[in-house]
């Protein structure tokens, strides 16, 4: 695929990241080697690539199960037994089934665990990300952030970062806000031991999967009142600003509503007797 055709799949404001992504694809295709991105890409990128792109297999890894931000590996067919395609997750058994040597697929990332004493105040995602980005670290070089409380009443932030900046962060990050922090690199061999996302489940009933209908039901605002935040760019679908109130969403879509949080359309639960759609929505907490 030519570069200009590839870039047409993405909004103009994402052309820089899309251009970098194409370069990795080109390396894998031209030199028949596995090519890894250093950056973590959001779903609006890796969903478009699918399982195979331009004759090259696609594997994504964000360390955590169901992660949003993922590094991408472009894997030529020469590294695969048979004509198998790949899914988005790459656990050990999957790699064996597809004939891939685990040592050939070491994504260039490290998982950091950042711990602080939270007995005296509450610390949020924005506190951790603010301190990390205060080191002049770009957001796209970091994956998803998951917070967990430990038995000592400390709060721990787990975040995968590009391998090239991991030592720098370990050396330079001294505190989160005004709280002194401890930081370490975590072994990710056993993914069952890694922290998991926490959700609040909500069953919504909507006339259709139109954006304004779903946002209205999630926020308990009228459809008239949600038009303003949508048109003002306060609603994102798969991390992309979406101003089209009539856009039809799909199961698996991520919706971020400023002031209300992030949600995933998780499962289609069928229709009501009156023909309305029942959808299981998960809110990230």
Which ranges hold each PLM region?
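A generic structural motif
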Residues: 232, 260-262
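Ferredoxin-like alpha/beta domains used as RNA- or RNAP-binding modules
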Residues: 1-212, 218, 241, 248, ...
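Internal, well-folded beta-alpha domain core
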Residues: 215-216, 222, 234, 251
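Short, well-ordered loop/turn sites that connect or cap secondary structure elements
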Residues: 229-230, 249
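Short strand-turn-strand beta-turns centered on an Asx-Gly dipeptide
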Residues: 237-239, 258
């Amino acid at each position: 695929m030519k570069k200009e055709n590839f870039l047409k799949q993405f909004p103009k404001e994402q052309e820089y990241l899309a251009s970098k992504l194409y370069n990795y694809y080109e390396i894998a295709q031209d030199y028949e080697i596995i090519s890894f991105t250093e950056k973590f890409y959001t779903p609006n990128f890796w969903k478009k690539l699918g399982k195979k792109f331009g004759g090259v297999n696609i594997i994504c890894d964000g360390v955590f199960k169901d992660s949003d931000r993922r590094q991408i590996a472009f894997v030529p067919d020469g590294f695969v037994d048979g004509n198998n395609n790949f899914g988005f997750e790459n656990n050990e058994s999957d790699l064996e089934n597809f004939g891939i040597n685990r040592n050939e697929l070491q994504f260039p990332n490290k998982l950091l665990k950042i711990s602080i004493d939270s007995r005296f105040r509450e610390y949020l995602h924005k506190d951790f990300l603010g301190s990390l980005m205060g080191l002049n670290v770009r957001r796209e070089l970091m994956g998803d952030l998951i917070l967990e409380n430990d038995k000592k009443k400390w709060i721990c932030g787990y975040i995968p970062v590009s391998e090239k900046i991991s030592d720098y962060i370990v050396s330079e990050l001294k505190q989160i806000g005004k709280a002194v922090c401890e930081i370490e690199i975590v072994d990710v061999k056993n993914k069952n031991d890694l922290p998991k996302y926490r959700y609040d489940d909500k069953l919504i009933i909507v006339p259709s999967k139109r954006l304004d209908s779903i946002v209205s039901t999630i926020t308990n605002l009228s459809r008239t009142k949600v038009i303003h935040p949508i048109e003002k760019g306060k609603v994102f679908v798969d991390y992309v600003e979406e101003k089209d109130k009539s856009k039809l969403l799909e199961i698996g879509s991520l919706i971020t509503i400023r002031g209300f949080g992030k949600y995933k359309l998780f499962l289609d639960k069928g229709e009501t007797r009156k023909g309305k759609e029942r959808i299981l929505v998960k809110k990230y907490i």
